[in-house]
Amino acid sequence: MVGRGVPLCAAQPAVAEGGPAREPPPLLEVSPRKRLPAGPDQDPCGSRPAPEGAGAGPEQGHSAGGGGWCRHCHTKLVELKRQAWKLVSGPGTTLRDPCLSALLLDKLPAPGALPACRPEAERRCDVCATHLQQLTREAMHLLQAPASHEDLDAPHGGPSLAPPSTTTSSRDTPGPAGPAGRQPGRAGPDRTKGLAWSPGPSVQVSVAPAGLGGALSTVTIQAQQCLEGMWSVSRVNSFLPPACLAEAAVAAVAVADTVRECPPVAGPDGLSKAWGRGGVCTSALVTPTPGSVGGSTGPSAAASFFIRAMQKLSLASKRKKPHPPPPPATRGTSTYPTDFSGVLQLWPPPAPPCLLRAASKTKDNPGSIGKVKVMLRIWPAQGAQRSAEAMSFLKVDPRKKQVILYDPAAGPPGSAGPRRAATAAVPKMFAFDAVFPQDSEQAEVCSGTVADVLQSVVSGADGCIFSFGHMSLGKSYTMIGKDSSPQSLGIVPCAISWLFRLIEERRERTGTRFSVRVSAVEVCGRDQSLRDLLAEVAPGSLQDTQSPGVYLREDPVCGAQLQNQSELRAPTAEKAAFYLDAALAARSTSRAGCGEDARRSSHMLFTLHVYQYRMEKCGRGGMSGGRSRLHLIDLGSCEAAAGRAGEAAGGPLCLSLSALGSVILALVNGAKHVPYRDHRLTMLLRESLATAGCRTTMIAHVSDAPAQHAETLSTVQLAARIHRLRRKKAKYASSSSGGESSCEEGRARRPPHLRPFHPRTVALDPDRTPPCLPGDPDYSSSSEQSCDTVIYVGPGGAALSDRELTDNEGPPDFVPIIPALSRHRPSKGPRDADHFRCSTFAELQERLECMDGNEGPSGGPGGTDGAQASPARGGRKPSPPEAASPRKAVGTPMAASTPRGSSGPDTHQGTPEPCKAIVWGDQREDSSAWPELLVPEKAAVSGGRRPLPSPAPPPPQLLEACRAPEEPGGGGTDGVARTPPVGMSGQVAGSPMLPGATCPRLAAGSRCPERGLLTTTVTLQRPVELNGEDELVFTVVEELSLGALAGAGRPTSLASFDSDCSLRALASGSRPVSIISSINDEFDAYTSQAPEGGPLEGAAWAGSSHGSSISSWLSEVSVCTADSRDPTPQPRFSPDSLAGLDPGGPPALDGSLGDGSSGFLGPDRPDSPGPTWGPCPGEVAAVAPSRPGREPQAGPSRWASAAQTIHSSLPRKPRTASATTRVGCARLGQSPPGRGGLFEDPWLLRVGECDTQAASAGRAPSPTLGSPRLPEAQVMLACAQRVVDGCEVAARAARRPEAVARIPPLRRGATTLGVTTPAVSWGDAPTEVVACSGSLKASPTSKKGLAPKAGFLPRPSGAAPPAPPTRKSSLEQRSSPASAPPHAVNPARVGAAAVLRGEEEPRPSSRADHSVPRATSSLKARASKVEAAHRLAGHASLERYEGLAHSSSKGREAPGRPPRAVPKLGVPPSSPTHGPAPACRSGAAKAVGAPKPPVGGGKGRGLVAGGSRALGPSVKLSTASVTGRSPGGPVAGPRAAPRAGPSVGAKAGRGTVMGTKQALRAAHSRVHELSASGAPGRGGSSWGSADSDSGHDSGVNVGEERPPTGPALPSPYSKVTAPRRPQRYSSGHGSDNSSVLSGELPPAMGRTALFHHSGGSSGYESLRRDSEATGSASSAPDSMSESGAASPGARTRSLKSPKKRATGLQRRRLIPAPLPDTTALGRKPSLPGQWVDLPPPLAGSLKEPFEIKVYEIDDVERLQRPRPTPREAPTQGLACVSTRLRLAERRQQRLREVQAKHKHLCEELAETQGRLMLEPGRWLEQFEVDPELEPESAEYLAALERATAALEQCVNLCKAHVMMVTCFDISVAASAAIPGPQEVDV
């Protein structure tokens, strides 16, 4: 074995059953496991063994040994005896091989050798100093006397007691806590004897060569395996000599024989526990004498046999990739009493042969599907007479699977014969699917029970395995088992291990992608309270004390629905087992004082949610997927003494076992009437068992003790009844996607309010409120998302490649939300593209989600936010004053930030106190600035939601980073630059950020710079460092001078800004920022650069505060420009800015990453009020806000200088005062120097612009604004609007009274940028902040607030489920405060929504953007909309920050959305920007008109998309970063960033700013540019999700990668949807939770799905929502459910959805709504706003559906192709000149044909629209080719063809939906809901 052994070992590890070898290194892995052999060496691990003996360790403590031996010694003795005993043929016989036995006893280390036992001390017990020799002799002595049984039994008791032991290291500890051992611990009570023992006998042979220093090799042979000729070698020491192996083999054989012959004996906890429960556990330690080792030169026959057997075994197990066993230490370090995770890692249970058998067997005959498998396990009675008595009345025939029961009364229990004779009663015979006799091993039970169920689950059906029986019959042991050895593992750990093996095998065989999530819930106590056992380990868990936690809701359609439970992603079996350990530890029965009653009434439901995505080979390529669940239920015995009496009355008391049996029978039978239907346990069982397609297995436990005959009979009878009946299809049964539940079915059945997707959103969803069941908002039973399939269609219907869809199964190391960021990571290279590249929506969502920190990679779901938030919150709260005066805060925020940072002094200038509040580390912007805005958010962020555990740590870092930057200025940031939580773009950003640190400050300074500058809003959605939450979704608002942008469409200005910012680098790397960045592609490019600097700065900021970091980052970028010019390195206003931002939007920042931007805007906002600042109403003020914290520090001079610099470098048409106002407001006014200079700072300006800035500062400003939330919302809206109109109208829309006088859109290149002056003023700024911040983190607050609100409101049942804590969803977290929702409703939010919706329309109601005239743009005044939005926003905030408008109204809530809004401004450069605009337009209008949150982005279900969904058409991804979530951000970011060629697109852009149209166009061109230039940056589609599950989890992510062609620009529809945060409730689809980059999806898909719920691509929810939306405009919220029905965006979506619904496109929902062909449209399409934009005022429902229809699914690749990176495009053109010439003629001809067709289609569309009662020409602009394109160019032709194709599709859709839409149109009155005039911008 030595030589061969090595190979065997290698192979074996997979099998490694026992890793008893305590061999230090080699066997370490195993050693911990194998406590049996654990020798002194093992001791370290030995502790493990102790736990095994669960009692063993503890026993040490008690000196219960014979003659004063401690318990531990007793255990050792028992083990020694057992080992010896097993080697003897019979009780009285002597050891078969005396030499061997002697050797064994001689060398055998004490079974439970204490860790303390070291080689020397090994022999002596530390506790009682008993020498091992004594024990050995005693064992030998006992061996001679066949009393071993009693001895063995006796130890049982001891071991049971042992659990308390703490002596053994982790092992023991686990034992005591022993969830596993303990659970089975019940087993302890159930049966002391074999708690740890495997039911079946197994032999463990430890071979320790004398010369090897005690290294042991343990071979574990299970009896069953022995019989089958299979040997499982847990670990073979490669050094063992063949002789040893031979001896071991001999011993093993002997033992095997014995084992088979002997009845299982409860072994001492020590070693035997690992083995069969009652089964014989043989542990032989074979230690050849020193001489023998050398002496045996050749392997003996036995050795040869053994080796051969091992080799065969190894071959058999080759399939399984062994996990390299971690050092034993790993095992020993379990945090919980049990360590199943360690066991599965080191010694995964060997998979039963039937598990991986032919797939054909996977699908059982239809006949057996409805049947419930019932298995009977007979638990041996304790005592020597057990077998005899058992035989007397119980006969088992395992082969026939029958059990015969005799009446014990008939005869003496001892004599079966006499009894039989005397028995008058006929014996009762019962048949089952399997019968496990007393000596059955645990492994037998597991393999016989789990295999078929697992296959069903992997095949897409639900599965359920539960134990049933009276007390102390081993139910828990069967289900949980013990972690002592692989043989003692129960069904749950085995199921976990095998499920992953099966998934792995299935993945390899079919390419299916899997994602597994785990949830664990317990029903316990007399009150039947429901507990989420994983709440404590849930990354963003808010449940703790403040959250209502998990609850059950009765759904008339879907039955019981479990809501709000934590559903944690488990990429590996070890992780899932870790959650099992955590659940067991959290279970009430594991508590010290747990009494028998508690145990009886404790029922644990452990669920594995399996999401899978398959490539569909048929027809159009696509992916289909579904979710299936495996419920593993450990039912208590329910026999509470009081329970029986109360149970009859149906009281809350525990059900009796018989009552429970009746319930199970009824559920399994599908009976209409279920007894005790209101009992929580019944509801829980219904949720898991009642699914018609659920493969259920029941394991009934009975005792073979005659004394329990009555109980046994009743249990057997019930089990037999269940076995006989066939499951009827219950109408409520299909709660899960399980076999029958299909998307349509589940969705149709499940009321919209039940839509899982939005658990939180739902809570926010106003529509849902009435219908919502108690848990509605959070409702997301695992079954809720049970739609089975999600289909992803490639561009043009082409199949997506597996890689594209699955991302090669491997989660990207880094998922930059913004591709540009990804680019930043040069080292990554092409990989960057992969990072973001998520093959599927689900994957992307997952990743984004992760990034969000929701799940964890990012530092904690919502973790970043949470983490930061928590510190910030703490800090934030301190500055209530700031909070108190939001507006004041606006000005103050900057000051506030100062305190935060070293630059505080400067910052203080504005409002020192707020600054203080802003200090990230101490007080997140919690303080005053955000009180209003933040209050909700704050509540959510700081107080409302508890800091997420994971995120919390990062925030400090962030803070540190922020601070560092503050102090050192740029440098600090560098060092501190946050690293993205998981491989988020943050990393990239980190570097770039560094350089930009100074610049960003500068940028911030210039934030309010000139209106002339274009405002580039860069929303970096990268989890800035730790801020997973922040994800950096920094909305960088940069105002670039047009000139600067113009050059090459690249951020030439940026370059001019300053190398200091490394803007160039940023430009390339930060492109993502660009995405959000500007209306102009140039801006985009510019932004890219700036963002880099910004990001660095931002990173620093991020360090300081998530939101702030974004904001600061933006500001920094802005400042960057200014800063670079102005060497003065303010401590980087990062900190200050942050502070400033924070003050303005610190709460947002704190609460959410987005907040950072918000914070930034906050200053802007303050700036907006900035006029408040005074220096320059717009410019200086803007500047100040831009760098609220830092800049102010810099002081006017710095600002002035920066502003000037920026100005000069970014000469731009100065925006009118409007911009100035807004910017000024934004700027603390700290830089009194002319607003002209710094204000023009692109970032600042942007903020001022209201879009981006508003987004970034919106939050901060919000507080500043009269209504904290409103300003933010407004900002968001403004952003969106801006995007829409391409003007700053959004700013106007922002509540700011001073409407932002929008400067006519600047042209980016040929395109007119819809840049408005920062007129938005502070109102706008806040809005922008909202958008930006909202994107990041603000949203969480809102969301949270919303969610809770929704939770309360939505649940119509009145049985208000406990207010569901907002799930971890980043968004939600970001919007954490429950209060946020109300705030969200704040005008700011509403305003923002309105702005988005109103598209540039100054919403009088909001801030009366009196200042903004929409003059320059064609923005329609959407004042009324603002109001509506406002109103809507309130609701919307409840939603998912669905629309930008929504988000703005939500303020923080709009984190995702806000970014969208942010992009709005930078739409041209970044689709997202446009997206927000269109969304704004349509969404805003809707939002305003109707409370729906239709605002663009409203649909974006994911925050990431922020407005992405609403932005749908406008490449959400453009700023995915806009997406409030960094997760989404990265996606969008990449897409937007890639648009390096904005200039190209811009060129084509129309000179005229049609307002929304232009924005759309810009977005479109932006998309093209992205494809052209952005793609490269992206590295193709570098959308890896940083935190994809394992490969499985990554799930399908329609990859941006799919269009890796060229630049892999994000599809025009690309929008990054913020990952939905199912938050604590299972989302039906993994994708549901993941963020989606709509662009990633095929055009059609992307557009449709994205539009519908651009970020929500859970196929299910979104579908469902869509259908609901279809129902009516008012139903929009429902349809928005997914994203947050309440949000305007949602509304918008719902409007769209009507069409979908009519179409029956429920499924489509998964897919991003197809956006109008961005390519075809040129830029316009890219803007989600495009479609939303076009018909903003339109009745939400009508236009939205249309838009959906309109969306043509552009071929992403095509888009990419026609839109090479701007830089690329020119080159391409040059290179292809000759080709073009050659093709010119042909092209011209084709062009004429296409134009003719296009014209014809336009006419048809107009006619159809008339029938649909839509405004004629409503979407036409979507189908127009970007004017920037050369009509002669192939690109133009391609774009035209795409546009035509999209138009054709739109026409067809419209025609197909004429009737349906017409119906909805009739109720379009929804628009009436929008107060104020509704205008359609097209």
Curated annotation (Swiss-Prot):
Region Disordered, annotated ranges: 1-66, 149-201, 316-337, 729-785, 851-915, 940-993, 1121-1237, 1335-1728
Skewed-composition ranges (Pro residues): 948-957
InterPro entries: Kinesin-like_fam (IPR027640), Kinesin_motor_dom (IPR001752), Kinesin_motor_dom_sf (IPR036961), P-loop_NTPase (IPR027417)
Keyword hit for Lipid metabolism: no
Subcellular location(s) of the protein: Cytoplasm, Cytoskeleton
UniProt feature, compositional bias: Basic and acidic residues: 1397-1412
Ranges of Low complexity composition bias in the record: 165-187, 732-741, 1135-1152, 1532-1546, 1672-1685
Regions annotated as coiled coil: 1784-1812
Phosphoserine modified-residue sites: 31, 885, 1262, 1662
Domain Kinesin motor: start-end pairs: 371-725
Annotated Gly residues bias: 54-66, 856-865, 1495-1505
Known role: Atypical kinesin that plays a key role in enteric neuron development. Acts by repressing a cell growth signaling pathway in the enteric nervous system development, possibly via its interaction with GRB2 that prevents GRB2-binding to SHC, thereby attenating the GDNF-Ret signaling. Binds to microtubules but lacks microtubule-based motility due to the absence of ATPase activity. Plays a critical role in cerebral cortical development. It probably acts as a microtubule stabilizer that regulates neurite growth and radial migration of cortical excitatory neurons.
UniProt family annotation: Belongs to the TRAFAC class myosin-kinesin ATPase superfamily. Kinesin family. KIF26 subfamily.
Stated name of the protein: Kinesin-like protein KIF26A
Organism this protein belongs to: Homo sapiens
Gene: KIF26A
